[in-house]
A protein has these predicted regions:
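FAD-site-proximal beta/loop scaffold in flavoenzymes
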Residues: 118-138, 222-227, 231-291, 298-299
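Internal hydrophobic alpha-helix adjacent to the cofactor/substrate pocket in enzyme cavities
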Residues: 287-315
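FAD-binding beta-loop-beta segment adjacent to the flavin cofactor pocket
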Residues: 251-268, 313, 327-336, 343
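C-terminal auxiliary extensions adjacent to catalytic cores
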Residues: 326-363
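Beta1-alpha1 glycine-rich phosphate/pyrophosphate-binding loop at the start
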Residues: 1-70, 153-182
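A Rossmann-like FAD-binding core segment of flavoenzymes
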Residues: 26, 72, 78-79, 95, ...
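Residue-level detector of alpha-helix initiation sites
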Residues: 11, 127, 149-150
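FAD-binding core/adjacent interface of flavoenzyme oxidoreductases
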Residues: 1-5, 67-141, 229
Length: 363
């Protein structure tokens, strides 16, 4: 019997696990993931604010795997021998495969700033969210670094929580305007929202150094903190470069529109960890991984049956809804920018519906 090895339990692999409940294939399936839980990042802002519990935003992987007839192994991959078709884990175990699929997300960029690695909190890998949240909730002077969607959402959600508790506002530091990769209208709107909620914004200044008590910017500002959260965008996993697999300039695994590595067609990848050769500018966002998930499933089946796979075609625009705290949301879709409580209600509905598909227990 052939072996399928799933590395990571991101959005696309959750879908694969669910499909194995519905459709049995003549294949032995194993999933390797560093935590018993897979956390859904779309709900992190609501969790930070106190809208969701930890159980709302996580999937118990051993239970889901058991229902799908999949072997769950708690651990992380260290390297891949694509020619020998084996994966070495951080514990020293060697896992063989006939078919390998990667869905391990990304890591945190910019952490090489002096002092950041030793003093800043990081959410990635995502199973750190509960520990990080506890520390940020208890902070007297919380500071968030990062002006992208993740940094803004978390900072606004913490600000909303702290407002209810009568605590000081959150400070957000960004080397650019907020939401730099979005439209000028969206950039202007999110800054207006942040300022209206009394958030302390330090924009267009890079972090030059981090001490045990202060963040020092390139402009010479010294911002005191007792908890510092680093949310500066995605960085590729080092494993692909170390394993001498085909990668793009940033180190992400390079795949074709079938989600396969051209040089090693038995290796698939989806989500943030991969770059599509024909669509290199596709955003590193969960919505993309969700749309790739059915393509991944169909192409795993096609590979086993020695048939041609289907091709992933990105949409021209993706719906994005940022939680801005107090059950309001900023909806972005193409040229549409809308800030309203109805935007948050739509986001809440989408997120809860996603989680309901994979929840198997109350763990």
């Amino acid at each position: 019997m052939k072996k399928l090895l799933l590395i990571g339990a991101g959005h696309a692999h959750l879908h694969i696990m669910k499909k194995f409940q519905e459709e049995q294939l003549d294949i032995e399936v194993t999933i390797l993931s560093p935590s018993d839980y897979q956390y859904y990042s779309g709900m992190f802002s609501g969790y930070m604010e106190g809208v969701y519990s930890e159980k709302d935003m996580r999937v118990h992987l051993p239970s889901l795997a058991d229902l799908a007839g999949i072997t769950f192994i708690k651990g992380a991959a260290l390297s891949i021998d694509a020619k020998g078709k084996v994966v070495l884990t951080e514990k020293g175990d060697v896992l063989s495969y006939d078919l390998l699929s990667m869905d391990i997300g990304s890591y945190t960029a910019g952490i090489d700033v002096p002092g950041a690695r030793s003093h800043a909190l990081r959410i990635k890998p995502n199973y750190r969210i509960e520990e990080v949240a506890e520390k940020m909730w208890g902070a007297e002077y919380p500071v968030v670094v990062g002006g992208g969607a993740a940094g803004i959402e978390i900072a606004l959600s913490l600000t909303a929580r702290r407002k209810k508790e009568g605590k000081k506002a959150v400070t957000l530091i960004s080397h650019s305007t907020l939401l730099q990769s979005s439209s000028l209208k969206a950039q202007s709107k999110i800054e207006q929202i942040a300022r209206s909620k009394k958030m302390n914004l330090i924009l267009k200044e890079k972090v030059a150094n981090v001490t045990t008590t202060s963040v020092i910017t390139s402009g010479g500002k010294e911002i005191p903190y007792d908890q510092l959260l680093w949310l500066t965008g995605p960085k590729a996993p080092e494993m692909f470069r170390a394993s001498k697999l085909p990668i793009d300039e940033a180190g992400y695994l390079l795949v074709e529109d079938t989600l396969q590595v051209k040089e090693y067609p038995a290796i698939f990848a989806a989500g943030d960890c991969a770059t599509l050769r024909d669509y290199p500018d596709l955003p590193k966002a969960g919505v993309v991984a969700v749309r790739q998930s059915e393509v991944l499933w169909e192409n795993i089946k096609a590979f086993l049956q020695e048939k041609d796979g289907v091709r992933f075609q990105p949409k021209k625009a993706y719906l994005s809804i940022l939680s801005t705290g107090e059950k309001e949301g900023l909806l972005l879709y193409g040229k549409i920018t809308l800030h309203h409580n109805l935007s948050w209600k739509l986001k809440n509905k989408i997120d809860r519906r996603f989680m309901e598909k994979y929840k198997t227990t109350n763990l």
